[in-house]
């Protein structure tokens, strides 16, 4: 295992923690080092902070499943507007693809995972990667489309079911304005949106389940493959649903295994 941090090429004010399979000091082809898919984790926090509970506790599950894993520590608060977190995520996936050979990563099997506002960030990459408004702000022509998305109780809509604080932070606009509404991601889904895994709880009063339901409806209309699980119990922010993150929901914790099995199917990957 090799663990290190980097700042993606062409961006600033963020860092990425990388967990790579292979020799601790260098990676070389061997019986235990071969090309693998990758997962980029975007913790939540309302675009006001970055949750530790949705970072390493999540990443280690995908690493254990054989994925090269990355955690993005993106900009929040006043720095969350002007597409900065999304430019940071786009730069991260471009950086991973640029180093794919060196890191034994399969460049067309890179997924993004996000929780709550981090789910909005991950989903933004999957739905806005080809939007002229974002591309103008990004100013680069890198391959930034993720190959799959895993969205956990994500912030999606900018309507009556929106998590207003998240959308205000990322849009830099007041509730109900056109700029605010533009960040309703279900309105940007099209046939190029990547395959998506969604899960939410019916009891979530912070980010209502309608966010995932509307995303699923949009994916279905665009004929994008997806899998969705609505679990009956559990409030917002339960992460991997175990004692490590202080939300031990053994029933709900199954989402982790489900998402890995789904990704393995989409990526045709077996360890």
Language-model-detected regions and their locations in the chain:
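Primarily recognizes the serine-hydrolase "nucleophile elbow" in alpha/beta-hydrolase
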Residues: 94-164, 180
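N-terminal cap/lid segment of alpha/beta-hydrolase-fold proteins
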Residues: 1-34, 164
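Alpha/beta-hydrolase active-site loop
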Residues: 80-102, 254-255
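Short beta-strand/loop motif that positions the catalytic acidic residue
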Residues: 192, 198-200, 204
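Conserved alpha/beta-hydrolase "acid-adjacent" motif
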Residues: 205-214
């Amino acid at each position: 295992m090799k663990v290190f941090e980097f700042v993606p090429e062409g961006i600033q004010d963020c860092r990425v923690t990388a967990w790579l399979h292979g020799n601790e000091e260098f990676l070389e082809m061997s019986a235990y080092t071969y090309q693998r898919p990758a997962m980029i984790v975007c913790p939540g926090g309302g675009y006001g902070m970055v949750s530790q509970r949705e970072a390493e506790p999540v990443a280690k599950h995908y690493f254990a499943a054989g994925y090269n894993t990355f955690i993005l520590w993106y900009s929040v608060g006043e720095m969350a507007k002007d597409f900065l977190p999304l430019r940071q995520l786009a730069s991260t996936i471009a950086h991973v693809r640029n180093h794919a050979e060196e890191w034994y990563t399969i460049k067309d099997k890179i997924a993004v995972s996000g929780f709550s506002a981090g789910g909005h960030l991950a989903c933004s990459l999957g739905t806005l990667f080809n939007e002229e408004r974002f591309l103008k702000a990004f100013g680069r022509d890198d391959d930034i489309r993720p190959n799959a998305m895993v969205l956990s109780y994500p912030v999606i809509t900018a309507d009556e079911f929106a998590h207003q604080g998240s959308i205000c932070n990322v849009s830099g606009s007041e509730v109900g304005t056109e700029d605010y509404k533009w960040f309703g991601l279900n309105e940007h889904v099209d046939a190029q949106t990547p395959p998506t895994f969604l899960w939410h709880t019916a009891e979530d009063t912070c980010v209502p389940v309608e966010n995932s339901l509307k995303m699923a409806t949009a994916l279905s209309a665009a004929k994008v493959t997806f899998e969705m699980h609505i679990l009956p119990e559990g409030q917002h922010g339960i992460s991997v649903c175990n004692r490590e993150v202080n939300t031990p929901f053994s029933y709900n914790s199954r989402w982790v295994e489900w998402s890995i099995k789904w990704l393995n199917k989409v990526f045709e990957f077996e360890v």
